[in-house]
Regions:
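Bacterial N-terminal signal peptides
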Residues: 7-15
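Electrostatic cytochrome c docking/interface patches
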Residues: 18-41, 79
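Positively charged n-region of N-terminal signal peptides that target proteins for export
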Residues: 1-4
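Sequence context surrounding c-type heme c attachment/ligation sites in exported
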Residues: 36-44, 119-127, 141-142
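Short cysteine/histidine-rich zinc-coordinating motifs and their immediately flanking basic loops
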Residues: 59-63
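Sequence/structural segment immediately N-terminal to covalent heme-attachment motifs in c-type
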Residues: 31-55, 87
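Extracytoplasmic electron-transfer domains, predominantly the class I c-type cytochrome c fold
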Residues: 65-121, 132, 136
């Protein structure tokens, strides 16, 4: 009887441990914003990491493996011209493809997320990314 209880306790502990290791992670749906408002999209999707003023110090920045860049300095770091195509590609494809030296893929790949707002149609998502890029371009330090 004593051995049966011991075996039961061991199996119970193994089952609990095994169950804890099979945690399922569900994605959170993206919040709908105006497709036309780059500012609204920035505040909803970018400010947590890049900061309210796009300087890189958002409340979630400390959780990132690589510190989010100051988005107001992109033009200054590119000879005075906002790197629109590169910025757009980073939003569309993520940093692993566009900036391999970036390190980890902390930043989401926004194309599929934004496409999900329009029944997975890519066209409206591309327009959203264009408007977001135009907004960030308007934030460049003079």
């Amino acid at each position: 009887m004593r051995n049966s209880i011991l075996v039961f306790v061991i199996l119970l502990a193994a089952g609990i441990t095994g169950a804890a290791q099979n945690v399922e992670i569900h994605s959170v749906p993206i919040k709908r914003t105006s497709w036309a408002s780059g500012q609204q999209m920035y505040q909803e999707y970018c400010a947590a990491c890049h900061g309210e003023n796009a300087t890189g110090g958002g409340p979630a920045a400390s959780a990132c493996t690589v510190r989010p860049p100051n988005l107001t300095r992109l033009a200054a770091q590119n000879g005075g011209k906002f790197p629109f195509n590169h910025f757009y590609a980073v939003i569309q494809f993520g940093t692993q493809l566009t900036t391999p030296a970036h390190g980890t893929a902390d930043m989401p790949i926004w194309l599929p997320l934004l496409s999900s707002l329009n029944q997975d149609r890519e066209g409206p998502a591309l327009q959203r990314m264009h408007n977001l890029a135009r907004y960030v371009a308007s934030l460049q330090a003079q």
